[in-house]
Amino acid sequence: MGLSMSTYYADPKISRAEKEEQDADLRGKIEQIRVEFPRTGYRMLLHHLKRQGIKIGETRLRRIIEKFNLQFKPTKRFVKTTDSNHEFEIYPNLIEELMIDDINQVWTADLTYIRIENGFIYLAVIIDLFSRKIIGWQISKRIDRFLALDALKMAIERRNPPRGTIHHSDRGSQYLCDDYTELLTENGFHTSCSAKGNPYDNAWTESLMKTLKYDEIYMYEYKTYLNVVEKLPKFIEEVYNKKRLHSSLNYLPPEEFENKFANKNESEYQTNVSRPSFRL
């Protein structure tokens, strides 16, 4: 037809047959996006398509999703793995109402379980709160301090954070034990903890865990420890960090956001995460 991709999808003068062909083409593109991000909703789909050069209105996108029954189905919540019944020191919450506006300003940490055929294995992650990038992770058959320590060591080795970086976690014993807090102190971190029993206090890492589980682990039915150690690292490094769009990052993936932030004036990349607020 001699039209650009964006014009092609927006042209009101095309025939009925051409429109059907367009719908089928869009269906294919939506399904390709959903392969990597099964829970992607209407708004995020619009931004994924836009990055491919396709301009389409939300009304038409909704029509196509309904026409081809492409809606994603809500999934159940998963259980947290926090062990807060311990005698280690509890630290104050340092990020409540904090203006978060830089890389390596706040790191958050969390643990979760992964159900496989013969039991459970466990994942620990460290996230840069400003960019949402997973900067450290570890997988283990045991949920202990070594799992959390290895994820932290990876993050420190990769980022070489400045002294004064805040490390925020829930009140789990893995993050407040002597080995862990000593490593934080040695590297100049300020330690911060969530308020007791507050489900919103560490919502960013919980949201990430949900993404990992429902966009990858549950979707592809990991059955063995080998499945997890072979596939999950690739999803973290190649899909989540490099491809998953975040509305709070101006609809950019974490790694791309960090690269642009490093090369541009930071005022161009202020995000909604700047002022977290909590109901305590």
Write out the residue ranges for each language-model feature:
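Acidic/histidine-rich, metal-coordinating catalytic segments
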Residues: 162-177, 195, 252-253
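Conserved, non-catalytic sequence blocks in retroelement Pol enzymes and Pol-derived host proteins
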Residues: 37-39, 99-101, 116-117, 171, ...
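Mobile genetic element proteins and their domesticated derivatives, centered on retroelements
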Residues: 1, 8, 30, 45, ...
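Basic, flexible linker segments flanking DNA-binding modules
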Residues: 6-103, 198, 253-263
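C-terminal domain-tail junction helix/linker
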Residues: 16, 178, 185-189, 211-280
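An active-site-proximal beta-strand-loop segment
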Residues: 100-135, 141-142
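RNase H-like polynucleotidyl transferase catalytic core
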Residues: 74-80, 167-171, 185-204, 219-224
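Active-site beta-loop-alpha junctions of metal-dependent nucleic acid enzymes
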Residues: 119, 138-160, 176
